[in-house]
């Protein structure tokens, strides 16, 4: 594992004094320009440590060998490819983004010391996902949400498709919102329009209800929760009909940044009656909901029509 230089405070030392001494002892260098960037709280094996996090861009002297490990200069754009603790990946990403001074709390599992079980940034809980192997099986490790999409990390999602049949006269209980073909068996899918502020595919129509599976949670529980949070639908486990799994991997650019989405998705159907006027939409995630004719929707997808979340 790779870590930065540093160590424990000696008696009566200030953070700056500890920094200067440790860097000198471990590298032989004398820092001439440095800045405190954040405070880290590490919890592991019933131990709580507070770490003052610095970066330095000025030094003098010649680098010496270190009796505590190997010293190596690493290009900034390669930092996140190193073998690092998952919590370290979080604060390295913050440093690379030149984030303002931050407080990051990281809690590791007492048995598996490499498994990050909780992360809080400036008092706000961060989302952690189970890291999957090539077969979609959890490895026992977790990773923060934005890092999963930055580093192309496979993770789990649950997808719920809300479907309804169209009656012969093309009228559906005063809630018709899609044109249908009279020559084909007709079904409609309910799609949600993603909010303008989403980090991927803003303003595009997407699955009826979908979401990531938090680390340690089941896909079914997550799918039920997302239905409630996004659409206000209170479903029971028996209401969701499992129809399969799907592995998807897309590579896009959003807001000038790479966005990789490697998902192992469990798919469900929800066939109970749904009226758009009765939905309670999660405004931070969804602009609106609309019924789409399934046959026309399939044609749009085949033709890669704009306005949909396709990958």
Where are these regions (language model features)?
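Residue-level signal for well-ordered, solvent-exposed loop/turn and beta-edge residues enriched
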Residues: 1, 35, 135-137, 141, ...
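Conserved Nudix-box catalytic region and its N-terminal flanking loop in Nudix hydrolases
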Residues: 1-25, 39-41, 110, 114-123, ...
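Acidic, metal-coordinating catalytic segment for phosphate/diphosphate chemistry
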Residues: 124-167
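Intrinsically disordered, low-complexity terminal tails and inter-domain linkers enriched
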Residues: 166-186
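Hydrophobic pocket-lining residues within nucleotide cofactor-binding pockets
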Residues: 9, 40, 58-59, 63, ...
